[in-house]
Amino acid sequence: MGSTVSVPQTRTMRGDELSADDAWATLRKYGGWQLTRDSLVRFRYGDGMSHSRALAFQVCLAIIPGAIALVGLSSVTHQEELGQVLELTLRRLAPGDGEAVRQALGSGHHVRDALALWLGLATTMVALTTAMAQFERGANRIYGVERDRPFHRKYARAAVLALVAGVIMITGFTVMVGGGAIGEAMTEVFGWGGGTRQAFALVRWPLGFLLALVATVTLFRASPRRRQPGHSWLAFGALVALVLWTLFTLALALYTAHNSTFGATYGPLTAVMALLLWSFLSSIALFLGVAFAAQLEACRAGCVPPAHPDTGPTAEEEREPLVGAVGSAVIAAVRRVVALLGRKRPGRTS
């Protein structure tokens, strides 16, 4: 369990919901630097990194089998063009030569059993549902809520969020990150002209951003076990999450594109490792956005501190006897050396 301070439910303090104007006024009163510092503290003591790792793992379990199942189902349902667009897009997005992606997606073409493919898609939805449940757990800890909803309510809500917010978020992220690859795939499969590609290139950024923003605000509103403020208030934290996600994605893209040792190290697993890193960084961005939204609401309620005071043992109490003795001896030796060097330094004449 985390040690974050519970955020008061400001939605019940007045008759109406908090809006974007309230968020802006609170931010100006609070100060950007203090909000950033306290949000990072709330993220840390809410076990944000641990929940980010768990969420990234669940997202990968949903994306990989889901892509294989969709490519296979496109052949079974005689929608080969859509399957080709998906396959070409993923192969262009994958770093390296994309051989592992080609083989994985090719296995979907060889599977002609519709039942097996539908079961694979169902497995993807189960993994995405558990990812939404994991997001609820992480958001609760960051807000200072120590217990999640009962099992049936938690996973029923997570299933709905997976079908709504999860699918919309993945679509928005894919349109923004892979818009160029999607345009090339659509041109190759459906014969898009230059005008259509240019129009798609102009529309994909605002469209993808809007889809990702709507999905993120929906997650921030529906996931925590508390009465959340209005959507426009939560849009502040969602914007922080999307800005961080964009920066993380660009940094990862530059790293994989200009680091030749990355592909040489992982070989055919390069695409999988890139997906793991991207999922982890995306999860960090989401939970940091939750932390910013939570701390801003805490300030609205009276500048509640982000974490409880440390009641653990002091440094002297937790230090092992041998380690403490060795450390004290090293510190004493360093101090003697510094003092000796100070005495040997020639004095300056005025």
Show where each model-derived region lies.
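Membrane-embedded alpha-helices and immediately adjacent juxtamembrane helical segments
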Residues: 2-350
